[in-house]
Amino acid sequence: MVLLGLLQSGGSVLGQAMEQVTGGNLLSTLLIACAFTLSLVYLFRLAVGHMVQLPAGAKSPPYIYSPIPFLGHAIAFGKSPIEFLENAYEKYGPVFSFTMVGKTFTYLLGSDAAALLFNSKNEDLNAEEVYGRLTTPVFGKGVAYDVPNAVFLEQKKILKSGLNIAHFKQYVSIIEKEAKEYFKSWGESGERNVFEALSELIILTASHCLHGKEIRSQLNEKVAQLYADLDGGFSHAAWLLPGWLPLPSFRRRDRAHREIKNIFYKAIQKRRLSKEPAEDILQTLLDSTYKDGRPLTDDEIAGMLIGLLLAGQHTSSTTSAWMGFFLARDKPLQDKCYLEQKTVCGEDLPPLTYEQLKDLNLLDRCIKETLRLRPPIMTMMRMAKTPQTVAGYTIPPGHQVCVSPTVNQRLKDSWVERLDFNPDRYLQDNPASGEKFAYVPFGAGRHRCIGENFAYVQIKTIWSTMLRLYEFDLINGYFPSVNYTTMIHTPENPVIRYKRRSK
Protein backbone atom coordinates (compact mmCIF):
# COMPACT_ATOMS: atom_id res chain seq x y z
CA MET A 1 0.00 0.00 0.00
CA VAL A 2 2.47 2.62 1.16
CA LEU A 3 5.03 1.93 -1.54
CA LEU A 4 2.80 2.22 -4.55
CA GLY A 5 3.05 5.82 -5.66
CA LEU A 6 6.67 5.97 -4.52
CA LEU A 7 7.58 3.17 -6.86
CA GLN A 8 5.86 4.81 -9.80
CA SER A 9 7.51 8.17 -9.28
CA GLY A 10 10.96 6.66 -8.76
CA GLY A 11 13.36 9.25 -7.45
CA SER A 12 11.01 12.21 -7.81
CA VAL A 13 10.24 12.26 -4.07
CA LEU A 14 13.87 12.96 -3.26
CA GLY A 15 14.13 15.64 -5.91
CA GLN A 16 10.98 17.40 -4.76
CA ALA A 17 12.07 17.15 -1.13
CA MET A 18 15.44 18.70 -1.90
CA GLU A 19 13.89 21.54 -3.83
CA GLN A 20 11.35 22.27 -1.09
CA VAL A 21 13.88 22.20 1.71
CA THR A 22 16.92 23.78 0.10
CA GLY A 23 15.57 26.17 -2.49
CA GLY A 24 18.51 25.12 -4.64
CA ASN A 25 21.21 25.77 -1.99
CA LEU A 26 24.16 23.51 -2.83
CA LEU A 27 25.32 22.77 0.73
CA SER A 28 21.81 21.99 1.91
CA THR A 29 21.26 19.82 -1.12
CA LEU A 30 24.44 17.87 -0.39
CA LEU A 31 23.43 17.38 3.25
CA ILE A 32 20.01 16.09 2.23
CA ALA A 33 21.58 13.82 -0.37
CA CYS A 34 23.96 12.40 2.24
CA ALA A 35 21.10 11.78 4.65
CA PHE A 36 19.12 10.08 1.92
CA THR A 37 22.11 7.95 0.87
CA LEU A 38 22.68 6.86 4.46
CA SER A 39 19.01 5.92 4.66
CA LEU A 40 19.35 3.80 1.53
CA VAL A 41 22.47 2.13 2.91
CA TYR A 42 20.58 1.39 6.11
CA LEU A 43 17.67 -0.12 4.19
CA PHE A 44 20.06 -2.19 2.08
CA ARG A 45 21.90 -3.51 5.12
CA LEU A 46 18.56 -4.23 6.75
CA ALA A 47 17.47 -6.19 3.70
CA VAL A 48 20.73 -8.15 3.55
CA GLY A 49 20.49 -8.85 7.26
CA HIS A 50 17.10 -10.44 6.70
CA MET A 51 18.50 -12.99 4.26
CA VAL A 52 18.57 -15.75 6.85
CA GLN A 53 19.26 -19.37 6.16
CA LEU A 54 16.11 -21.43 5.78
CA PRO A 55 15.65 -24.63 7.80
CA ALA A 56 17.04 -27.77 6.18
CA GLY A 57 14.74 -29.04 3.45
CA ALA A 58 12.71 -25.83 3.32
CA LYS A 59 11.82 -24.42 -0.08
CA SER A 60 11.77 -20.70 -0.78
CA PRO A 61 8.88 -19.13 -2.71
CA PRO A 62 9.52 -18.60 -6.44
CA TYR A 63 11.65 -15.47 -6.80
CA ILE A 64 11.14 -13.04 -9.68
CA TYR A 65 14.65 -11.98 -10.63
CA SER A 66 15.50 -8.39 -11.56
CA PRO A 67 18.81 -7.22 -13.06
CA ILE A 68 18.37 -3.79 -11.42
CA PRO A 69 20.15 -3.62 -8.04
CA PHE A 70 18.21 -2.31 -5.05
CA LEU A 71 15.26 -0.92 -7.03
CA GLY A 72 14.40 -4.37 -8.36
CA HIS A 73 10.91 -4.42 -9.85
CA ALA A 74 9.94 -1.03 -8.40
CA ILE A 75 9.43 0.68 -11.75
CA ALA A 76 7.43 -2.13 -13.38
CA PHE A 77 5.31 -2.64 -10.28
CA GLY A 78 4.71 1.06 -9.79
CA LYS A 79 3.66 1.56 -13.39
CA SER A 80 1.00 -1.15 -13.36
CA PRO A 81 0.82 -3.02 -10.04
CA ILE A 82 -2.32 -5.05 -10.71
CA GLU A 83 -1.07 -6.26 -14.09
CA PHE A 84 2.30 -7.10 -12.53
CA LEU A 85 0.71 -9.21 -9.79
CA GLU A 86 -1.78 -10.93 -12.08
CA ASN A 87 0.97 -11.86 -14.54
CA ALA A 88 3.10 -13.19 -11.68
CA TYR A 89 0.15 -15.23 -10.40
CA GLU A 90 -0.31 -16.81 -13.84
CA LYS A 91 3.40 -17.64 -14.14
CA TYR A 92 4.43 -18.54 -10.59
CA GLY A 93 1.23 -19.46 -8.79
CA PRO A 94 -0.30 -18.04 -5.59
CA VAL A 95 2.99 -17.45 -3.71
CA PHE A 96 6.00 -15.57 -5.08
CA SER A 97 8.66 -13.07 -4.02
CA PHE A 98 10.39 -10.09 -5.60
CA THR A 99 12.54 -7.15 -4.52
CA MET A 100 11.72 -3.43 -4.51
CA VAL A 101 13.83 -0.64 -2.97
CA GLY A 102 15.95 -3.09 -1.02
CA LYS A 103 13.05 -5.01 0.50
CA THR A 104 11.77 -8.46 -0.40
CA PHE A 105 8.01 -8.76 -0.81
CA THR A 106 6.21 -12.10 -0.77
CA TYR A 107 2.66 -11.99 -2.11
CA LEU A 108 -0.05 -14.46 -1.10
CA LEU A 109 -2.73 -14.42 -3.78
CA GLY A 110 -5.99 -16.32 -3.66
CA SER A 111 -8.04 -17.28 -0.65
CA ASP A 112 -6.00 -20.30 0.46
CA ALA A 113 -2.65 -18.50 0.42
CA ALA A 114 -4.07 -15.32 1.97
CA ALA A 115 -5.25 -17.35 4.96
CA LEU A 116 -1.67 -17.35 6.26
CA LEU A 117 -1.70 -13.57 6.75
CA PHE A 118 -5.23 -13.19 8.02
CA ASN A 119 -4.97 -16.09 10.49
CA SER A 120 -1.49 -15.18 11.73
CA LYS A 121 -0.45 -14.01 15.17
CA ASN A 122 1.18 -10.60 15.48
CA GLU A 123 4.38 -12.09 16.87
CA ASP A 124 4.75 -14.06 13.63
CA LEU A 125 3.56 -11.52 11.06
CA ASN A 126 3.94 -8.07 12.54
CA ALA A 127 1.91 -5.00 11.54
CA GLU A 128 3.60 -2.35 13.69
CA GLU A 129 6.90 -2.55 11.82
CA VAL A 130 5.09 -1.89 8.55
CA TYR A 131 2.64 0.85 9.52
CA GLY A 132 4.01 2.44 12.70
CA ARG A 133 6.33 4.81 10.88
CA LEU A 134 3.42 6.34 9.01
CA THR A 135 0.71 6.38 11.65
CA THR A 136 2.58 7.53 14.76
CA PRO A 137 3.37 11.09 13.55
CA VAL A 138 -0.27 11.46 12.46
CA PHE A 139 -2.18 9.80 15.32
CA GLY A 140 0.38 10.49 18.02
CA LYS A 141 2.25 8.32 20.50
CA GLY A 142 0.52 5.87 22.79
CA VAL A 143 -2.09 4.66 20.32
CA ALA A 144 -2.47 2.29 17.36
CA TYR A 145 0.84 0.94 16.04
CA ASP A 146 2.92 2.87 18.60
CA VAL A 147 1.91 0.54 21.45
CA PRO A 148 2.30 -3.20 22.06
CA ASN A 149 -0.22 -5.20 20.09
CA ALA A 150 -2.10 -6.29 23.21
CA VAL A 151 -2.74 -2.63 24.11
CA PHE A 152 -3.74 -1.80 20.54
CA LEU A 153 -6.27 -4.64 20.58
CA GLU A 154 -7.74 -3.22 23.80
CA GLN A 155 -8.01 0.20 22.17
CA LYS A 156 -9.75 -1.30 19.14
CA LYS A 157 -12.16 -3.17 21.40
CA ILE A 158 -13.04 0.08 23.20
CA LEU A 159 -13.64 1.90 19.92
CA LYS A 160 -15.68 -0.96 18.54
CA SER A 161 -17.93 -0.92 21.61
CA GLY A 162 -18.94 2.61 20.63
CA LEU A 163 -19.71 1.65 17.05
CA ASN A 164 -22.97 -0.08 17.93
CA ILE A 165 -26.50 -0.23 16.55
CA ALA A 166 -27.89 2.15 19.18
CA HIS A 167 -25.44 4.80 18.00
CA PHE A 168 -25.99 3.98 14.31
CA LYS A 169 -29.71 4.67 14.71
CA GLN A 170 -28.85 8.20 15.82
CA TYR A 171 -26.15 8.66 13.19
CA VAL A 172 -28.51 8.16 10.22
CA SER A 173 -30.44 11.36 10.88
CA ILE A 174 -27.23 13.27 11.68
CA ILE A 175 -25.61 12.21 8.40
CA GLU A 176 -28.75 12.90 6.38
CA LYS A 177 -29.06 16.43 7.79
CA GLU A 178 -25.38 17.15 7.15
CA ALA A 179 -25.71 15.87 3.57
CA LYS A 180 -28.83 17.91 2.80
CA GLU A 181 -27.16 21.04 4.14
CA TYR A 182 -23.99 20.36 2.15
CA PHE A 183 -25.78 19.85 -1.17
CA LYS A 184 -27.68 23.13 -0.89
CA SER A 185 -24.68 24.78 -2.53
CA TRP A 186 -24.86 22.52 -5.60
CA GLY A 187 -27.87 24.23 -7.12
CA GLU A 188 -30.02 22.71 -9.86
CA SER A 189 -27.33 21.22 -12.10
CA GLY A 190 -23.64 21.32 -12.84
CA GLU A 191 -20.37 19.41 -12.85
CA ARG A 192 -18.39 18.63 -9.72
CA ASN A 193 -15.28 16.82 -8.56
CA VAL A 194 -17.25 14.19 -6.71
CA PHE A 195 -14.24 12.81 -4.84
CA GLU A 196 -13.37 16.22 -3.37
CA ALA A 197 -17.01 16.88 -2.48
CA LEU A 198 -17.50 13.52 -0.81
CA SER A 199 -14.19 13.84 1.04
CA GLU A 200 -15.46 17.07 2.60
CA LEU A 201 -18.84 15.56 3.44
CA ILE A 202 -17.31 12.40 4.91
CA ILE A 203 -15.19 14.52 7.26
CA LEU A 204 -18.20 16.59 8.33
CA THR A 205 -20.44 13.60 9.00
CA ALA A 206 -17.75 11.46 10.64
CA SER A 207 -16.68 14.30 12.92
CA HIS A 208 -20.28 14.99 13.98
CA CYS A 209 -21.07 11.33 14.65
CA LEU A 210 -17.80 10.15 16.14
CA HIS A 211 -16.27 13.23 17.77
CA GLY A 212 -19.42 14.86 19.08
CA LYS A 213 -21.06 18.24 18.65
CA GLU A 214 -18.34 20.15 20.55
CA ILE A 215 -15.65 19.20 18.04
CA ARG A 216 -17.97 19.33 15.01
CA SER A 217 -18.97 22.89 15.89
CA GLN A 218 -15.34 23.95 15.48
CA LEU A 219 -14.94 22.35 12.05
CA ASN A 220 -14.45 25.47 9.94
CA GLU A 221 -12.21 26.04 6.92
CA LYS A 222 -9.13 26.45 9.11
CA VAL A 223 -9.70 23.17 10.94
CA ALA A 224 -10.54 21.44 7.67
CA GLN A 225 -7.14 22.56 6.38
CA LEU A 226 -5.51 21.18 9.52
CA TYR A 227 -7.12 17.82 8.81
CA ALA A 228 -5.83 18.00 5.24
CA ASP A 229 -2.30 18.80 6.45
CA LEU A 230 -2.46 15.97 8.97
CA ASP A 231 -3.76 13.59 6.33
CA GLY A 232 -0.84 14.67 4.16
CA GLY A 233 1.36 12.76 6.59
CA PHE A 234 0.23 9.56 4.89
CA SER A 235 2.66 10.07 2.02
CA HIS A 236 5.30 8.19 0.11
CA ALA A 237 7.92 10.64 1.38
CA ALA A 238 6.93 9.79 4.95
CA TRP A 239 7.58 6.14 4.24
CA LEU A 240 10.85 6.65 2.36
CA LEU A 241 12.56 9.57 4.09
CA PRO A 242 13.67 10.00 7.73
CA GLY A 243 11.00 11.68 9.83
CA TRP A 244 13.41 14.33 11.13
CA LEU A 245 13.95 15.91 7.71
CA PRO A 246 12.56 19.48 7.65
CA LEU A 247 10.22 18.91 4.72
CA PRO A 248 7.33 21.37 4.47
CA SER A 249 4.81 18.50 4.39
CA PHE A 250 6.34 17.04 7.57
CA ARG A 251 6.26 20.42 9.30
CA ARG A 252 2.63 20.97 8.27
CA ARG A 253 1.73 17.50 9.52
CA ASP A 254 3.39 18.05 12.89
CA ARG A 255 1.89 21.51 13.35
CA ALA A 256 -1.58 20.24 12.43
CA HIS A 257 -1.19 17.37 14.88
CA ARG A 258 -0.42 19.76 17.72
CA GLU A 259 -3.24 22.18 16.88
CA ILE A 260 -5.89 19.47 16.42
CA LYS A 261 -4.80 17.82 19.65
CA ASN A 262 -5.26 21.15 21.45
CA ILE A 263 -8.78 21.47 20.04
CA PHE A 264 -9.55 17.96 21.21
CA TYR A 265 -8.05 18.55 24.66
CA LYS A 266 -10.40 21.49 25.22
CA ALA A 267 -13.41 19.49 24.03
CA ILE A 268 -12.44 16.57 26.27
CA GLN A 269 -12.12 18.81 29.32
CA LYS A 270 -15.43 20.50 28.54
CA ARG A 271 -17.15 17.12 28.21
CA ARG A 272 -15.65 15.90 31.48
CA LEU A 273 -17.23 18.88 33.25
CA SER A 274 -20.56 18.58 31.45
CA LYS A 275 -23.60 17.07 33.12
CA GLU A 276 -25.40 16.45 29.81
CA PRO A 277 -25.47 12.82 28.63
CA ALA A 278 -23.92 12.23 25.21
CA GLU A 279 -24.06 9.31 22.79
CA ASP A 280 -20.86 9.39 20.75
CA ILE A 281 -17.41 7.86 20.58
CA LEU A 282 -15.91 10.66 22.66
CA GLN A 283 -18.19 9.72 25.55
CA THR A 284 -17.41 6.03 25.04
CA LEU A 285 -13.69 6.76 25.39
CA LEU A 286 -14.21 8.94 28.46
CA ASP A 287 -16.21 6.19 30.16
CA SER A 288 -13.86 3.31 29.25
CA THR A 289 -10.91 1.74 31.03
CA TYR A 290 -8.22 -0.77 30.13
CA LYS A 291 -8.38 -4.28 31.55
CA ASP A 292 -6.22 -3.22 34.50
CA GLY A 293 -8.72 -0.49 35.40
CA ARG A 294 -6.65 2.42 34.11
CA PRO A 295 -8.73 5.13 32.38
CA LEU A 296 -7.65 6.52 29.04
CA THR A 297 -5.58 9.69 29.18
CA ASP A 298 -6.65 12.82 27.32
CA ASP A 299 -3.74 12.28 24.93
CA GLU A 300 -4.81 8.70 24.20
CA ILE A 301 -8.41 9.81 23.63
CA ALA A 302 -7.32 12.57 21.26
CA GLY A 303 -5.06 10.20 19.33
CA MET A 304 -7.77 7.56 19.03
CA LEU A 305 -10.27 10.17 17.80
CA ILE A 306 -7.81 11.31 15.13
CA GLY A 307 -7.08 7.73 14.12
CA LEU A 308 -10.74 6.76 13.91
CA LEU A 309 -11.53 9.71 11.65
CA LEU A 310 -8.55 9.58 9.30
CA ALA A 311 -8.40 5.80 9.05
CA GLY A 312 -11.80 5.79 7.38
CA GLN A 313 -12.00 9.17 5.70
CA HIS A 314 -10.11 8.37 2.51
CA THR A 315 -11.46 4.86 2.12
CA SER A 316 -15.10 5.94 2.52
CA SER A 317 -14.77 8.96 0.23
CA THR A 318 -12.96 6.91 -2.42
CA THR A 319 -15.58 4.16 -2.33
CA SER A 320 -18.41 6.71 -2.46
CA ALA A 321 -16.85 8.48 -5.44
CA TRP A 322 -16.23 5.28 -7.40
CA MET A 323 -19.80 4.13 -6.82
CA GLY A 324 -21.03 7.42 -8.24
CA PHE A 325 -19.25 6.70 -11.50
CA PHE A 326 -20.51 3.11 -11.68
CA LEU A 327 -24.09 4.35 -11.20
CA ALA A 328 -23.63 7.20 -13.68
CA ARG A 329 -22.37 4.73 -16.29
CA ASP A 330 -25.32 2.38 -15.75
CA LYS A 331 -28.40 4.62 -15.77
CA PRO A 332 -30.92 1.73 -15.55
CA LEU A 333 -29.17 0.57 -12.37
CA GLN A 334 -29.21 4.12 -11.02
CA ASP A 335 -32.96 4.30 -11.71
CA LYS A 336 -33.47 1.02 -9.85
CA CYS A 337 -31.60 2.42 -6.84
CA TYR A 338 -33.84 5.49 -6.87
CA LEU A 339 -36.95 3.33 -7.18
CA GLU A 340 -35.72 1.25 -4.24
CA GLN A 341 -35.71 4.43 -2.14
CA LYS A 342 -39.43 4.90 -2.82
CA THR A 343 -40.28 1.23 -2.43
CA VAL A 344 -38.54 0.87 0.93
CA CYS A 345 -39.03 4.33 2.43
CA GLY A 346 -42.29 5.52 0.90
CA GLU A 347 -43.35 7.41 -2.21
CA ASP A 348 -42.89 10.80 -0.52
CA LEU A 349 -39.34 9.87 0.58
CA PRO A 350 -39.55 10.78 4.28
CA PRO A 351 -36.41 11.17 6.43
CA LEU A 352 -34.32 8.02 6.54
CA THR A 353 -34.26 5.60 9.46
CA TYR A 354 -31.72 2.94 10.33
CA GLU A 355 -34.32 0.21 9.79
CA GLN A 356 -35.04 1.47 6.27
CA LEU A 357 -31.35 1.75 5.54
CA LYS A 358 -30.91 -1.94 6.34
CA ASP A 359 -33.61 -2.82 3.79
CA LEU A 360 -31.93 -0.97 0.91
CA ASN A 361 -30.49 -4.21 -0.39
CA LEU A 362 -29.68 -3.10 -3.94
CA LEU A 363 -27.78 -0.07 -2.69
CA ASP A 364 -25.98 -2.35 -0.26
CA ARG A 365 -24.93 -4.65 -3.12
CA CYS A 366 -23.76 -1.66 -5.17
CA ILE A 367 -21.42 -0.65 -2.35
CA LYS A 368 -20.23 -4.23 -2.01
CA GLU A 369 -19.51 -4.51 -5.73
CA THR A 370 -17.72 -1.15 -5.74
CA LEU A 371 -15.50 -2.39 -2.93
CA ARG A 372 -14.81 -5.55 -4.93
CA LEU A 373 -13.67 -3.79 -8.10
CA ARG A 374 -12.16 -0.70 -6.47
CA PRO A 375 -10.99 -1.57 -2.96
CA PRO A 376 -9.33 1.58 -1.62
CA ILE A 377 -6.24 -0.27 -0.39
CA MET A 378 -4.47 -2.47 -2.91
CA THR A 379 -2.11 -4.24 -0.53
CA MET A 380 -2.16 -5.26 3.13
CA MET A 381 1.27 -5.98 4.58
CA ARG A 382 2.96 -7.60 7.54
CA MET A 383 6.62 -8.12 8.47
CA ALA A 384 7.61 -11.77 8.84
CA LYS A 385 9.25 -12.25 12.24
CA THR A 386 9.43 -16.04 12.14
CA PRO A 387 9.64 -18.55 9.26
CA GLN A 388 6.18 -19.06 7.73
CA THR A 389 5.10 -22.03 5.64
CA VAL A 390 2.43 -21.80 2.95
CA ALA A 391 1.66 -23.85 -0.16
CA GLY A 392 4.82 -25.90 0.36
CA TYR A 393 7.09 -22.84 0.58
CA THR A 394 8.82 -21.29 3.59
CA ILE A 395 8.91 -17.50 3.90
CA PRO A 396 11.95 -16.35 5.91
CA PRO A 397 11.92 -13.61 8.56
CA GLY A 398 12.41 -10.14 7.11
CA HIS A 399 10.09 -10.54 4.14
CA GLN A 400 7.20 -8.13 3.72
CA VAL A 401 4.27 -10.54 3.48
CA CYS A 402 1.43 -9.12 1.38
CA VAL A 403 -2.16 -9.82 0.37
CA SER A 404 -3.84 -7.82 -2.38
CA PRO A 405 -7.63 -7.40 -2.00
CA THR A 406 -7.70 -5.95 -5.52
CA VAL A 407 -6.22 -9.08 -7.07
CA ASN A 408 -8.06 -11.56 -4.85
CA GLN A 409 -11.36 -9.91 -5.71
CA ARG A 410 -10.92 -10.34 -9.46
CA LEU A 411 -9.18 -13.70 -9.83
CA LYS A 412 -10.47 -15.72 -12.77
CA ASP A 413 -10.72 -18.84 -10.63
CA SER A 414 -13.05 -17.18 -8.12
CA TRP A 415 -15.17 -14.61 -9.94
CA VAL A 416 -17.44 -15.06 -12.97
CA GLU A 417 -17.22 -12.10 -15.39
CA ARG A 418 -14.72 -10.74 -12.93
CA LEU A 419 -14.28 -7.25 -14.41
CA ASP A 420 -18.00 -6.48 -14.80
CA PHE A 421 -19.83 -4.30 -12.28
CA ASN A 422 -22.70 -6.59 -11.36
CA PRO A 423 -24.30 -6.04 -7.93
CA ASP A 424 -26.65 -8.96 -8.52
CA ARG A 425 -23.78 -11.45 -8.52
CA TYR A 426 -24.26 -11.69 -4.75
CA LEU A 427 -27.75 -13.10 -5.27
CA GLN A 428 -26.28 -16.09 -7.08
CA ASP A 429 -23.92 -18.89 -6.22
CA ASN A 430 -20.36 -18.24 -7.35
CA PRO A 431 -16.98 -19.85 -6.58
CA ALA A 432 -15.93 -16.92 -4.39
CA SER A 433 -18.83 -17.43 -1.99
CA GLY A 434 -17.19 -20.60 -0.72
CA GLU A 435 -13.78 -18.98 -0.24
CA LYS A 436 -13.13 -17.26 3.07
CA PHE A 437 -10.63 -14.69 1.80
CA ALA A 438 -11.73 -14.08 -1.79
CA TYR A 439 -13.46 -10.86 -0.71
CA VAL A 440 -11.47 -8.83 1.82
CA PRO A 441 -11.87 -5.05 1.25
CA PHE A 442 -11.94 -4.51 5.02
CA GLY A 443 -9.30 -7.09 5.78
CA ALA A 444 -9.94 -10.11 7.97
CA GLY A 445 -8.75 -11.77 11.14
CA ARG A 446 -7.24 -9.82 14.03
CA HIS A 447 -6.73 -6.68 12.00
CA ARG A 448 -10.14 -6.51 10.33
CA CYS A 449 -11.38 -2.94 10.07
CA ILE A 450 -13.61 -2.11 13.05
CA GLY A 451 -15.28 0.70 11.10
CA GLU A 452 -16.87 -1.50 8.42
CA ASN A 453 -20.45 -1.22 9.72
CA PHE A 454 -20.16 2.53 10.28
CA ALA A 455 -18.77 2.93 6.75
CA TYR A 456 -21.84 1.20 5.31
CA VAL A 457 -24.19 3.38 7.38
CA GLN A 458 -22.34 6.50 6.30
CA ILE A 459 -22.07 5.67 2.58
CA LYS A 460 -25.64 4.35 2.31
CA THR A 461 -27.08 7.42 4.03
CA ILE A 462 -25.07 9.85 1.90
CA TRP A 463 -25.88 8.09 -1.36
CA SER A 464 -29.55 7.72 -0.42
CA THR A 465 -29.63 11.50 -0.01
CA MET A 466 -27.78 12.06 -3.28
CA LEU A 467 -30.07 9.74 -5.25
CA ARG A 468 -33.14 11.48 -3.85
CA LEU A 469 -31.80 14.88 -4.88
CA TYR A 470 -30.02 14.31 -8.20
CA GLU A 471 -29.53 12.25 -11.33
CA PHE A 472 -25.91 11.58 -12.25
CA ASP A 473 -24.27 11.22 -15.66
CA LEU A 474 -20.80 10.73 -17.07
CA ILE A 475 -19.36 13.71 -18.94
CA ASN A 476 -18.95 12.74 -22.60
CA GLY A 477 -18.74 9.09 -21.54
CA TYR A 478 -15.63 9.66 -19.40
CA PHE A 479 -15.08 6.97 -16.75
CA PRO A 480 -11.99 7.52 -14.56
CA SER A 481 -8.93 5.34 -14.58
CA VAL A 482 -7.32 4.38 -11.28
CA ASN A 483 -4.73 6.74 -9.83
CA TYR A 484 -2.04 4.33 -8.63
CA THR A 485 0.32 7.12 -7.54
CA THR A 486 -1.62 7.74 -4.34
CA MET A 487 -1.69 5.48 -1.30
CA ILE A 488 -5.46 5.17 -1.59
CA HIS A 489 -6.59 4.26 -5.12
CA THR A 490 -8.61 7.29 -6.08
CA PRO A 491 -10.29 7.98 -9.45
CA GLU A 492 -8.38 10.17 -11.93
CA ASN A 493 -10.06 13.51 -12.67
CA PRO A 494 -13.30 12.48 -10.89
CA VAL A 495 -15.66 15.12 -12.31
CA ILE A 496 -19.30 14.06 -12.72
CA ARG A 497 -22.43 15.75 -14.09
CA TYR A 498 -25.59 16.10 -12.01
CA LYS A 499 -29.12 17.45 -12.40
CA ARG A 500 -31.77 17.92 -9.73
CA ARG A 501 -34.63 15.45 -9.94
CA SER A 502 -38.02 16.85 -10.87
CA LYS A 503 -40.51 16.59 -8.02
UniProtKB/Swiss-Prot annotation:
Gene Ontology biological process terms in this record: cholesterol biosynthetic process via 24,25-dihydrolanosterol; negative regulation of amyloid-beta clearance; negative regulation of protein catabolic process; negative regulation of protein secretion; positive regulation of oocyte development; regulation of cholesterol biosynthetic process; response to human chorionic gonadotropin; response to insulin
Entries under Pfam families matching the protein: p450
EC number: 1.14.14.154
Keyword field: Cholesterol biosynthesis, Cholesterol metabolism, Endoplasmic reticulum, Heme, Iron, Lipid biosynthesis, Lipid metabolism, Membrane, Metal-binding, Microsome, Monooxygenase, Oxidoreductase, Steroid biosynthesis, Steroid metabolism, Sterol biosynthesis, Sterol metabolism, Transmembrane, Transmembrane helix, Ubl conjugation
Reactions it catalyzes: a 14alpha-methyl steroid + 3 reduced [NADPH--hemoprotein reductase] + 3 O2 = a Delta(14) steroid + formate + 3 oxidized [NADPH--hemoprotein reductase] + 4 H2O + 4 H(+); lanosterol + 3 reduced [NADPH--hemoprotein reductase] + 3 O2 = 4,4-dimethyl-5alpha-cholesta-8,14,24-trien-3beta-ol + formate + 3 oxidized [NADPH--hemoprotein reductase] + 4 H2O + 4 H(+); 24,25-dihydrolanosterol + 3 reduced [NADPH--hemoprotein reductase] + 3 O2 = 4,4-dimethyl-8,14-cholestadien-3beta-ol + formate + 3 oxidized [NADPH--hemoprotein reductase] + 4 H2O + 4 H(+); a 14alpha-methyl steroid + reduced [NADPH--hemoprotein reductase] + O2 = a 14alpha-hydroxymethyl steroid + oxidized [NADPH--hemoprotein reductase] + H2O + H(+)
Biochemical pathway: Steroid biosynthesis; zymosterol biosynthesis; zymosterol from lanosterol: step 1/6
Necessary cofactors: heme
PANTHER family: 24-HYDROXYCHOLESTEROL 7-ALPHA-HYDROXYLASE, CYTOCHROME P450 FAMILY 7
Purpose: Sterol 14alpha-demethylase that plays a critical role in the cholesterol biosynthesis pathway, being cholesterol the major sterol component in mammalian membranes as well as a precursor for bile acid and steroid hormone synthesis.
Name under which the protein is recorded: Lanosterol 14-alpha demethylase
Natural source organism: Rattus norvegicus
